[in-house]
Design a protein with these regions (language model features):
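Helix-to-loop junction immediately C-terminal to a conserved catalytic motif
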Residues: 56
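Conserved ABC transporter NBD signature motif
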Residues: 64-75, 79-80
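Conserved ABC ATPase signature
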Residues: 96, 137-144
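Conserved ABC ATPase "signature" region
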Residues: 104, 108, 115-133
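Conserved catalytic motifs of ABC-family nucleotide-binding domains
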Residues: 158
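Catalytic Walker B motif of ABC-type/P-loop ATPase nucleotide-binding domains
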Residues: 162-165
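ABC transporter nucleotide-binding domain
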Residues: 181-270
Length: 315
């Protein structure tokens, strides 16, 4: 039976947290619906981990309110722990125990019966391609397999809300794909997922996103609507000297922003028709350019644009 609830699975109002005079989370407000994958996106220091720890009830807020799975995270912390699962960046696997023994440990911790544990574990291990590794020591697993085992342990008691702190950092592409396939299957069961990530390409897999910077909420919407807010168009220039391209064009007429992405430069321009003009500007500056083409905007382009606007307005 689906676990969806008639009200928002997560409600956050004016949530704030300070450490030694530094504001880590500054007045956050957002809501997450039942059976939704909601992403907290931003660079290191954006407040993602602090927010998740407050939502999990392990870190008390200094101000504001948060309700998760129908529980006040401060006043009803004990009830909350039975309704959610929190998977921090370093999940507590026991490396001298096998995959099966780790799952059994967490099932016992949450009071999950044997029959329910075996049925749930069987489905989750099959979904993650780990059925044949039941008797392997956790310490002998790859990084991606450890994360998938951590997710299985976190889900063994069938939580209503799953909180994940950058679970795919350092994980190989195949394991990342498996991980997300499991998350989508959880949504089909009615589970709500709140996940933090610094991978902006991965963020596009979420149903909705909260873009964070320095503990503040910049924007919150679906990936498609967020990208639709980007002014102008995106042009990608490739060059053996990408930094010189960025520096030469950052303040050129019609250029709203310039971002280094590997060996390319993403230019946010008011009109892609400026490409010949920009190519002439590079030639005049003696900067080589192999190609310059209009492309579809990415979340990375949007984030850089939004941060630039915030800095320009003093935010």
């Amino acid at each position: 039976m689906p676990l969806t609830e008639p009200v928002d699975a997560v409600q956050v109002e004016a949530l704030s947290k300070r450490f030694a005079g530094v504001t880590a989370v500054d007045g956050l407000e957002f809501r997450v619906g039942p059976a939704e994958i909601f992403g907290l996106v931003g660079p290191d220091g954006a407040g993602k981990t602090t927010t998740l720890r407050m939502l999990a009830g392990v870190l008390p807020p200094d101000a504001g309110l948060a309700r998760v799975a129908g529980c006040d995270v401060v006043r009803e912390a004990e009830m909350l722990r039975n309704r959610i699962s929190y998977m921090p960046q370093r999940f507590g696997l026991y490396e001298d125990l096998t995959v099966e023994e780790n799952i059994r440990f967490y099932a016992d911790l949450f009071g999950t019966g044997r029959a329910a544990r075996e049925e749930r574990a069987g489905r989750l291990l099959a979904a993650s391609g780990m059925s044949e590794f039941r008797r392997r020591l956790a310490g002998q697993l790859s990084g991606g397999m450890k994360q998938k085992l951590g997710l299985t342990c976190a889900l063994i008691h069938t939580p209503r809300v799953l909180l994940l702190d950058e679970p795919t950092t350092g994980v190989d592409p195949v394991s990342r794909r498996d991980f997300w396939r499991i998350l989508y299957s959880l949504v089909d069961e009615g589970v709500t997922v709140v996940i933090s990530t610094s991978y902006l390409d991965e963020a596009e897999r979420c149903h909705r996103l909260a873009l964070l910077r320095s503990g503040r909420l910049l924007l919150c919407d679906t990936p498609a609507r967020l990208k639709g807010r980007l002014r102008g168009e995106v042009v990608v220039a490739t060059s053996p000297r990408p930094r010189n391209v960025r520096d030469a064009l950052a303040r050129a007429p019609g250029v709203l922003g310039a971002l280094l992405v590997g060996t390319a430069v993403h230019l946010n321009v008011d009109d892609a028709a400026r490409i010949p003009e920009l190519q002439r500007a590079l030639a005049a500056a003696g900067v080589p350019c192999d190609s310059m083409l209009r492309v579809e905007a990415t979340m990375e382009d949007l984030f850089v644009s939004v941060v630039g606007e915030a800095e320009g307005s003093g935010g």
